[in-house]
UniProtKB/Swiss-Prot annotation:
Catalysed reactions, semicolon-separated: ATP + H2O + 4 H(+)(in) = ADP + phosphate + 5 H(+)(out)
GO MF term set: ATP binding; ATP hydrolysis activity; proton-transporting ATP synthase activity, rotational mechanism
Localisation: Cell membrane
Sequence similarity: Belongs to the ATPase alpha/beta chains family.
Annotated membrane topology: Peripheral membrane protein
E.C. number: 7.1.2.2
Enzyme class: translocase
Protein known as: ATP synthase subunit beta 1
Record note on quaternary structure: F-type ATPases have 2 components, CF(1) - the catalytic core - and CF(0) - the membrane proton channel. CF(1) has five subunits: alpha(3), beta(3), gamma(1), delta(1), epsilon(1). CF(0) has three main subunits: a(1), b(2) and c(9-12). The alpha and beta chains form an alternating ring which encloses part of the gamma chain. CF(1) is attached to CF(0) by a central stalk formed by the gamma and epsilon chains, while a peripheral stalk is formed by the delta and b chains.
Residues holding ATP: G152, G153, A154, G155, V156, G157, K158, S159
GO CC, one annotated term: proton-transporting ATP synthase complex
Record keyword Glycosyltransferase present: no
Length: 456
């Protein structure tokens, strides 16, 4: 078969303008292969700019690339290997090995652009996926087959919480796909080593597009990880865990690509197609009658702004929202989850039962009231509160401290052994605190314990 070859006529950053024969223009989203002194890379057609010219985004390096260089139209979108061959491997955006092992033998390859499941194929039956992390299981439970977002600014513990969730949920069995989008290289290597030492790597695929790579790589690596998860769901009919760190970097890469194309941005400098790009991506993360994809996604908040357009565009697609707050981290309480800003549609009696629901509502009420009283305490002190309010403040502080927890993934740094808390122990502990059984105890005794059984 004759190769369809084009010629690069201009290079502007990562945007390539390429000339083809008029009758052989590649389609939008098709992959183009080009070579530099560093290796062979792909570009993606994003626009037809003339009768015989296209604009493409380089999904790789462009150093050393020059006008006049040849480009081969592959005739299809980027395709990545899927199935058993990629289990236990660390891959890049093209599905090529970056773990120092031989390339995965690609018996099957799937394009990274796929249609979302049809409405009649979706499975609406959901159940709770208990994580062993107290504040999540109590206040914002995760749905199996649902989408959960971890929102927070820089340095509040999103990645550590994500790694603990990977550790706790992966231990229950099943297949996992971790997609690192625009994050630090050391985090990817650290996660890979953690998975290897815990014995869950053989059932996990790690796909990385680091922050030092081109915006095209960071924009498309999320689709590579999602495609691998979709194959496990649709063809192997398995329940899959999809971890994405970080959705903001995916959006940011799209913004960079949009700017490179000269498109007019919206508020905050984001691309005008922000909602559609996020929607297309999120709608593919779905549970069907074949199997489920349970996704847990980190979302960075620029300047800790929960109203940032990137966060707002993501909110509507999620079943559970877990918000981490700097003021809680400053108190030394980890995970630094704000129970009042976090929510889950699974927190209703249908999913969790009446007892769990009522306890969660009481916890939210007592913490909200404590926040209101905190302003009085800051100005006038505890002495000005009524006896009833003083009792409420002490119980609220015990609850706040009790929701802290030592993690398995941070054992080597803290020297404290991680704890997985069963849901019954969690509910019994909260019940006892709310009922006043521990009113005589110090608030500090409730920091970083598992349940009431750990109180001496």
């Amino acid at each position: 078969m004759k190769k369809n070859i084009g010629t690069i006529i201009s290079i502007s950053g990562f945007v390539l303008k390429i000339e083809f024969n008029e009758s052989e223009l590649p389609e939008i989203s098709h992959a183009l292969e080009y070579k530099t002194h560093q290796g062979t890379y792909l570009a993606e057609v994003v626009q037809h700019t003339g009768i015989n010219t296209v604009s493409a985004i380089a999904i790789g390096e462009v150093s050393g690339l020059a006008r006049g260089a040849e480009v081969i139209n592959l005739g299809h979108p980027i395709e990545v290997p899927v199935g058993e061959t990629v289990q236990g491997r660390m891959l890049n955006v093209y599905g090529k090995a970056i773990d120092g092992l031989p390339e995965p033998e690609a018996e099957v390859k799937w394009p990274i652009f796929r249609e979302q499941p049809l409405l009649r194929e979706l499975d609406t039956n959901k159940e709770i996926l208990y994580t062993g992390i107290k504040v999540i299981d109590l206040i914002c439970p995760i749905l199996k087959g649902g989408k959960t977002g971890l929102f927070g600014g820089a340095g509040v513990g999103k990645s550590v919480l994500m790694q603990e969730l990977i550790n706790n949920i992966s231990m229950m069995g099943g297949n996992s796909v971790f997609t690192g989008v625009g994050e630090r290289v050391r985090e990817g290597i650290g996660l890979y080593n953690e998975l290897e030492s815990s014995g869950v790597l053989p059932q996990t695929t790690v796909v990385l597009g680091q922050m030092n790579e081109s915006p095209g790589v960071r924009m498309r690596v999320a689709l590579t990880g999602l495609t691998i998860a979709e194959y496990l769901r649709d063809e192997e009919k398995k329940d899959v865990l999809l971890f994405i760190d970080n959705v903001f970097r995916f959006i940011q890469a799209g913004s960079e690509v949009s700017s490179l194309q000269g498109k007019i941005p919206i508020t905050g400098g984001y691309q005008s197609t922000l909602s559609k790009e996020v929607g297309d991506f999120q709608d593919r993360i779905a549970s069907t009658k074949n199997g489920s994809i349970t996704s847990i996604q980190c979302v960075f908040l620029p300047a800790d702004d929960i109203d940032d357009p990137s966060a707002v565009a993501t909110f509507s697609h999620l079943d559970s929202t877990i918000v981490l707050e700097r003021s809680i981290a400053a108190l030394g309480i980890f995970p630094a989850v704000n129970p009042l800003q976090s929510f889950s549609r699974a927190l209703n009696p249908t999913f969790v039962g009446e007892r769990h629901y009522q306890l969660a509502v009481q916890v939210k009420f007592i913490l909200q009231r404590y926040m209101e009283l905190q302003e009085i305490i800051n100005v006038l002190g505890m002495a000005e509160l009524s006896d009833e309010d003083k009792k409420l403040v002490h119980r609220a502080r015990k609850i706040r401290n009790f929701l802290s927890q030592p993690f398995y993934v941070s054992e080597k740094f803290t020297g404290t052994e991680g704890i997985f808390v069963e849901i019954e122990d969690l509910l019994s502990s909260v019940e006892r605190i709310l009922n006043g059984e521990y009113d005589e105890r110090s608030e500090r005794e409730f920091l970083f314990i598992g349940s009431y059984k750990d109180l001496k």
